Amino acid sequence: MKILVSNDDGVNAQGLHCLSEALCSLGEVIVVAPDRNRSGASNSLTLENPIRVETLETGKRYSVKGTPTDCVHFAVNKLLDPWPDIVVSGINHGANLGDDVIYSGTVAAATEGRHMGLPAVAVSLVGETHFASAAHYACLLVSRLRTHPLPSDQILNVNVPDLPLEQIKGIKVTRLGNRHRGEKMIVMQDPRGKPVYWIGPPGEKQDAGEGTDFHAIEQGYVSITPLQVDMTAYGSVSELTTWVGEFK
């Protein structure tokens, strides 16, 4: 089994190292990850600049001057022949819950893998301590996917509580919750007195009741949310057809 591993925290991130080491027990692991932290890159591609790749360990580990999506795109389309059997993204240093998935480079790397037709999993630790717990569940899921593949348009978004493995209560299949919108912008001055702006923290959780990814994490469970690459709102097609018909 050939496993492509990427992330958005960068090629030297602890979570990436822990994940790739754990997955070695399941097959051949190739790491292709950004050269630096690219959190919040979402599904962006580098189009106006060349993508430079540094080989850190031939056949095993590559550093890419680009986004998480660039990494998977390059690995599948150029680097790896034959293609990998699965894409695993993570372990992210922090949660990807609710609306976070819109911005997440971790989820984006998995999405690009699925867009290429490969099974894909995004794994995040809700904290920065117990990476071994997240790696354990990543291995369980990859093993399961090998024998029981998902539908062709789905990826798994996995969030793991920052707890020792023995304290995690189990797994819950969840839906995405959501947050209040984040409105805070942090204003500072550069050394020349000109204003600079930082995007502030995300909004507080809003829809976080039972059945959501937020709720599962709060209760000490691993949250697994199926996401789909096809973003069509099928439930609205009929209503929108009627709405558009009123223009005639």
From Swiss-Prot:
Record carries keyword Transmembrane helix: no
Subcellular localization(s) per the UniProt record: Cytoplasm
Principal subcellular localisation of the protein: cytoplasm
Positions annotated to bind a divalent metal cation: D8, D9, S39, N92
EC number assigned by the record: 3.1.3.5
Taxonomic lineage of the native organism: Bacteria, Pseudomonadati, Pseudomonadota, Gammaproteobacteria, Aeromonadales
The keyword Protease is assigned to this record: no
Cofactor binding, per record: Binds 1 divalent metal cation per subunit.
Catalytic activity: a ribonucleoside 5'-phosphate + H2O = a ribonucleoside + phosphate
Gene Ontology CC annotations of this record: cytoplasm
Superkingdom of the source species: Bacteria
Keywords of this entry: Cytoplasm, Hydrolase, Metal-binding, Nucleotide-binding
Protein name as catalogued: 5'-nucleotidase SurE
